[in-house]
Amino acid sequence: MTHLTIRASRPYSVYVEPDAIRRIHEVKQAQEADRFWIITDQTVADLHMASIRRQLENVFPVTAQHVSTVEPGEGSKSLSVYQRLLEEGIEQGATRKTMILAVGGGMIGDLAGFVAATFLRGVPFLQIPTTLLAHDSSVGGKVGLNLRWGKNLVGAFYQPSAVLYDPAFLQTLSDREWRSGFFELLKHGLLARPTFAEELIGLGLSDIKQLPLADWISAGIQVKQHIVEQDERETGIRAFLNYGHTFGHAVEYASEDLSHGEAVGIGLVFVSILEGNEYQTNRLVELIHRLGVVLPERQPFERYLELMKRDKKNDVSIRFVVKGQDGFSLEAIDQKRLKNAYDQTVRCLHWA
């Protein structure tokens, strides 16, 4: 069992353990809630909702429950789905004492968290992650929606009341979801735990599923905890958590069938080339092929350039989180270097 306390503007606990939902009785806002409004996607609802509702009833037998489901995938992080959820909240009688439970992966955490941040000017919410990828997104308080111009262009910083993470949920994940979460875990290792990263980068898909998950998830969360506690609202070093994400987000947004983490894997190759880190580039390319990532249809450089210009870290120039001799920094990269890195990424990955 891991118990961490995230010391943000509103401190909260993170539990990583079997049957973590039982910890809800320790959350003050849950004790005071007039109902639990569960927001999830249809896949998670089919797999886990009956069990989750029973566990909630065991702890709070008289607290009403309401479940809202959305379609799986990034398409649900939209203004139209957000509006439907707000209206559903009004129709089911939610109040400022209602607690939202975000049950699912990163998309659900972002969407349900943004509903919580804005419904009736803010109601409490819990993150209950069901994917490996969500070890990253469930901690730190970033919530939001996508627009047709790019990812996460509408959003807020809104901390959960707690994060209740049961690794048993991960046993129902597809291979793609395992890969997706693994690349975010690797990113945390590359940022702050080189030995951890070196262990991860040599693994295959079957190895990943046999990891001591609670320990490895906790290690990834602790990297993020250390950064978020210093820079909650991303005015400085929190931007380093976007390592591999500037190009990765562009690839993800331009592709219909690539997961977030798989796109981050490609983004890590791109940024390793920018850094001139040939060893890391080669290891990442080997890993991407070993894990069976199916590369998306490649778009022209100009399309990715357009999407990178919309990244929230960028103003006049396109800035990347890069590692140099003195550690990580945000560096403005000119278009010529970006095109060169793109061409090398295409060659290294044999990206048709």
Swiss-Prot record:
Residues binding Zn(2+): E184, H245, H260
Gene Ontology biological process terms, A to Z: amino acid biosynthetic process; aromatic amino acid family biosynthetic process; chorismate biosynthetic process
Amino acids binding NAD(+): T130, T131, K142, K151, F169, L170, Q171, T172
Subcellular location: Cytoplasm
Molecular function terms, GO-annotated: 3-dehydroquinate synthase activity; metal ion binding; nucleotide binding
Pfam families in UniProt: DHQ_synthase, DHQS_C
Catalytic activity: 7-phospho-2-dehydro-3-deoxy-D-arabino-heptonate = 3-dehydroquinate + phosphate
Domain of life, per lineage: Bacteria
Gene3D superfamilies: 3.40.50.1970, Dehydroquinate synthase-like - alpha domain (1.20.1090.10)
Keywords, sorted A to Z: Amino-acid biosynthesis, Aromatic amino acid biosynthesis, Cobalt, Cytoplasm, Lyase, Metal-binding, NAD, Nucleotide-binding, Zinc
UniProt pathway: Metabolic intermediate biosynthesis; chorismate biosynthesis; chorismate from D-erythrose 4-phosphate and phosphoenolpyruvate: step 2/7
First-listed, main subcellular location of the protein, grouped into a coarse class: cytoplasm
Entry's Gene Ontology cellular component terms: cytoplasm
E.C. designation(s): 4.2.3.4
Cofactor note: Binds 1 divalent metal cation per subunit. Can use either Co(2+) or Zn(2+).
Cofactor needs: Co(2+); Zn(2+); NAD(+)
Sequence similarity: Belongs to the sugar phosphate cyclases superfamily. Dehydroquinate synthase family.
Function description: Catalyzes the conversion of 3-deoxy-D-arabino-heptulosonate 7-phosphate (DAHP) to dehydroquinate (DHQ).
Protein name, as recorded: 3-dehydroquinate synthase
